[in-house]
Every structure is written in structure tokens, then in C-alpha cells.
């Protein structure tokens, strides 16, 4: 990615302090279990280690570390029974979910030969889970529980831990980067309009405003011909260009991409929402004609670029790019009633990482429908198979909401006029999907990613404390 971010995850373990002097063998036992547990947290995140907590004071010290680090998530290992005061001081001042990991060391007791310290050390992790959740509820904290076993390995537990860490990456990306708004939303698309201060207060995403005059001049000082040539080759490697492509043909486009990449790094931009509604002449027309593929090159590198000035869909694209590896802007295009299929897609910039069925294509059109000017269009080709859609919307009080659905992309004819589009079948049928999706009140744009990702999106939603409407899965 052009702007790298890394989630910070607070990790600690708790046990009842009264057990340790009674059964001293529990000390090395718990130390070994905690050391092994920390290794299950993927190295894609930064671990903030709160240690093994057996007293209120140790819990407060862990909480100080978590608060100072501004953790995106807390993962708590329950080693044995513990009272909730071992936990609450560590999380009291945090506004992130606490994931309680209840992993038992042994698959089953050796009933006849189990003594008290063996039971407490290897078989009693589940004893305090309900108590912890009860007090997290009373403290107004979000929470989740993962139950499993150490002996023999437990892929389900490992997958859940990794999924939570993947979701935590979204929060860190929102907090550590910026959103660039260039111009303003498409006139009259009021579902796209947004209060940027409310966005920051609720989602921790800061908006930087940029004028098109700056964008027109952004490449004026790019003179490194080696960098431009390398980027031109990157463009040719990414797209099949109608009529053939050469480095000379995409030279100006490559120069702008080099400039945009540096701008993204300098401004720490992970989201772009842009729309131009002026005269497509001169330098304005030049950039406007090549902006779609130029921004597609940014999307490929992790910066979500949305057309029509849609900030909310740029957020959805970034979420899916972060958790699923691709994020394609889409909207409801058409319904094939004969086949009970929804045609979903959009014109404009797209994500090469979703184009698994075919290499993306680029062609020149005389007019961008509904917009100023004409120029290059890019079309991407999502594969057949599972697909997830995510839209972000708001209620009348400004609270955000996720709207999600899973379906299956099927083979068959698609539109060929230059827009990305796919044929998606939903379990509820095309008519009912359109009704349910629309009734949820999303913006008319959504993001798409290959695979099924609702479970991870639910974790992201819990981290941001926003509700989710699941349309179908």
C-alpha cells in the first residue's frame, strides 16, 4: 500500500491471584500458556503486551499501556477462573471491543487422575466467561467470546483471532490516514452529502479538502523520466488498451500517476472522493480524460478512489480492500428477470485485484455519461463465485450504518460499453433483494469484494460501534 498502517492490539491474560501461593506450579504453567497464546496473534498487528494480570494494580498498569498506545482492539486470555476486577481496570477507559478468549489447554479431563492444580491450570478457563461479559455489559463495553481448545490445535480459534485482527486494521487505517475530497459531490445526489465533522467524530476519519486547480498542476514538476517510464509500463501491464498501448501513448497518464502517488504519501491519504463538473477543456480536460485509469492505479495500491464525490462509498471500498484484498465501487445496474439475476456495476475507477476473470481493459469514449467530457474508461472483470456487497449510510441523526449482502456471481453475458458489471444471484431472488436492499436506505453506491465477508464486516461494525443490516447471505 502507498500508505501503510498497522493495527495495535492490546493482549493480556488474567488469573485469580489467590491460587498462585496455594499452587505454585500454576505460575510457570500460566506463563507458558500465555507465551504460547501471544504467538497466535498474527504479526500483521502490533501487540501491546499487558502481561499476566492477577491483581487490580496490574490490571490498571495494563490499562495504562493500552490507553497510551491507543489500541484498536483488546484480546483477553482467560487462564483460569478470575474475578472481574482483574479485567475491568484494564479496559475501563477504552472504547474498543474486548475479545474474551476461552481456550482450554486439554481436550478433556482425565477424571480419575486430575488434582486441583491440574484442573485450575488446564481445564478451568471457562469458569469466568459469563462473569466477564456481565460486567462488560454493565460497563457499557462491546465484547465477543471465542471458545476452543489448545490440545491438538484449534483452527477455528486461530481463524477468529486473525479475523478480529483483520477487522482492527480498519480502525487503525481510519485513524492514521486522511480522506481527500476533490471538488464536491455530484449535484443533486443528496444521499452522498455528508457532514465531515460528524464523520470525524463518529468514525475518526479526517477530511482534507482539495481544489481541482491543485490537481491540474500536480504533475507540473514531475520530471523523472525513469519513474514516468516505469509507471507507464505498470499501466500497460495492468490494462489491455483498446487499439493497443505504448509507453508514449500513456506517458502523460503515467506522469500524473507518479504525481498522485507522491501526493498520497505526502498527505497520508487512504481515501479519495472526487467529482469534476466544470469545462473539460485545456489542462482540466486533459486530466479529466485520464483520471479514471490514473485513480485505478491508486486503488490497486490501497487508496480507495470513489467517483461522484462519494465519501461513504470510498470508506466501504477501503474496508473491503483492507479485510478482503479488493474493493470495487458498484451500484444496482439492471435486473435480468428472465434469469432472476441482478446486474451490478459502475463506470469509473476500479480495483485490478478484483479482475480475476480477465485482465482489465481501457478504452476511449467520446462522453462520460451524465458527466463532463470524455476520455478513458476502465472495465474490470470480477470472477464467478461468492461476492460481498457493502454500503454505508446514515440516519436522520447522522449515525452511520452498514448495509451488507452476500451473493454469487454467475457466468453469462455482461454489458460491454466500458463499465465494470457482474451478474449476481441472491438467495432471496432478484426482486426481493432489490426491495430489501433499497428499504435499508443505503446510498446508491456500494463496494464489492470477492468472497464472503459478512462475519468480518460484523467485527468491523462492532469496533466502530455501528449497526449492520444484513440483507441476505
Where is each model-derived feature located?
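Short, acidic/small-residue loops that bind anionic groups at enzyme active sites
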Residues: 89-115, 120-128, 293-308
